[in-house]
């Protein structure tokens, strides 16, 4: 099972950060040109993943402008739910990325309206957990509105550790047009940020989805019940605690519906 998971994530046991950066920038450029798009859109939270993906997007758009003489733009989108407690980190990330354009969309009015509409329709209160998923989906909706307006594509930040654990919202942060971090585990993403000379606070910020009102800033590792180091070791083919390995494999099987298009009568993956 471990080898199957490693192959499905495309994680290498060792990487050359310079080469990985080059390959991922080239991928972004090639995909944008082939799609006939004029730019890229990405939500910036201030964490490692969006900071890395954002920097790669910005560098790709700069190179396309220089190579073609045409206008290609990277749009960095801040998507707070009201006041973000770690806004300073998000601003540090923007300073590192230096995006062509940036917008801020406060998702709180839209999310609260959706939660209230649910209550009026059902008489029930939407749980904090499901409200968190609503936040993630509203963020992606806003990004697609911006992308459609400017003829751009929406970038996702899914990487190997998130893929294996299904640690993203279906049709939320899991909805996008392309994923430049695919094939990287968490520590490899850090290595690329070091190579790109990101601020230490950006590189080592405690990863959090920060979706639940009742548990603000809940660390990913607490939610997952394992550390990213354990996940990374597993994905690099190393031997880890059998209990953790079993947990990774159980979560992988449970979340595989997130790896496919909607199931139909003619699909076999779900059986």
Swiss-Prot record:
BP term (GO), one: NAD biosynthetic process
UniProt KW keywords: ATP-binding, Ligase, Magnesium, Metal-binding, NAD, Nucleotide-binding
Binding residue positions for Mg(2+): 49, 162
Signal found in the keyword field: no
EC number: 6.3.1.5
Highest taxon of source: Bacteria
Metabolic or biological pathway, per its Swiss-Prot or TrEMBL entry: Cofactor biosynthesis; NAD(+) biosynthesis; NAD(+) from deamido-NAD(+) (ammonia route): step 1/1
Function: Catalyzes the ATP-dependent amidation of deamido-NAD to form NAD. Uses ammonia as a nitrogen source.
NCBIfam families: nadE, PRK00768.1
Subunit structure: Homodimer.
Protein's name according to its UniProt entry: NH(3)-dependent NAD(+) synthetase
Organism the protein comes from: Exiguobacterium sp. (strain ATCC BAA-1283 / AT1b)
Taxonomy of the source species: Bacteria, Bacillati, Bacillota, Bacilli, Bacillales
Gene expressing this chain: nadE
